[in-house]
Amino acid sequence: MSDNDELQQIAHLRREYTRGGLRRHDLPAEPLPLFERWLRQACDAKLADPTAMVVATVDERGQPYQRIVLLKHYDEKGLVFYTNLGSRKAHQIENNPQVSLLFPWHMLERQVMVIGKAERLSTLEVVKYFHSRPRDSQIGAWVSKQSSRISARGILESKFLELKQKFQQGEVPLPSFWGGFRVSIEQMEFWQGGEHRLHDRFLYQRDSGAWKIDRLAP
């Protein structure tokens, strides 16, 4: 059998999920403490990029798009990420702020999905975070007109060296086209893999100022 033939056998790739379950008595009254516990466990397990999350948006035709970004802050007000404001996702959020986030912690047989509304961060919040980044990352933010078409990587590298020279003295200024978003938590779903595909799913949903918790069928 050729390598290509083996690749075509993906329908037979499967495994049992045996790392544990999630029961109602394990659940706090609000979702954030459980999210924080799972995130801490993902970090402690040395997962690659435990703060990586998929951000799903839609364009004006209803076409969905997904990409991975890094979570940079979270609290009761929502989950925060930063991006180029000229990017496709930023334009789509401007037209439709309803987004979905997904944390795929495969090695722990866990997923967390968030549904909420994205809102722009204040300039003060963005400036504070921007200047906490490594200096080369600050310069890199100036280089790319995100999602635009370019003919070669060399264009980016040349621009980076040019701007590194330009900003060699003093602080790198915040680009006017760079910012961040906070995604409110309207729903948060926790998924824990289970044996025989009997996975555990619990959905937290805001209900008149409180949190309603439902178990969902896998």
UniProtKB/Swiss-Prot annotation:
Cited function: Catalyzes the oxidation of either pyridoxine 5'-phosphate (PNP) or pyridoxamine 5'-phosphate (PMP) into pyridoxal 5'-phosphate (PLP).
Name of a matching Pfam family: PNP_phzG_C
Protein name: Pyridoxine/pyridoxamine 5'-phosphate oxidase
Top-level taxonomic group: Bacteria
InterPro entries: Pyridox_Oxase, Pyridox_Oxase_CS, Pyridox_Oxase_N, Pyridoxamine_oxidase_dimer_C, Split_barrel_FMN-bd
Binding site residues for FMN: 67-72, 82-83, 88-89, 111, 146-147, 191, 201
One annotated GO molecular function: pyridoxamine phosphate oxidase activity
HAMAP family: PdxH
Pathway: Cofactor metabolism; pyridoxal 5'-phosphate salvage; pyridoxal 5'-phosphate from pyridoxamine 5'-phosphate: step 1/1; Cofactor metabolism; pyridoxal 5'-phosphate salvage; pyridoxal 5'-phosphate from pyridoxine 5'-phosphate: step 1/1
Reactions performed catalytically: pyridoxamine 5'-phosphate + O2 + H2O = pyridoxal 5'-phosphate + H2O2 + NH4(+); pyridoxine 5'-phosphate + O2 = pyridoxal 5'-phosphate + H2O2
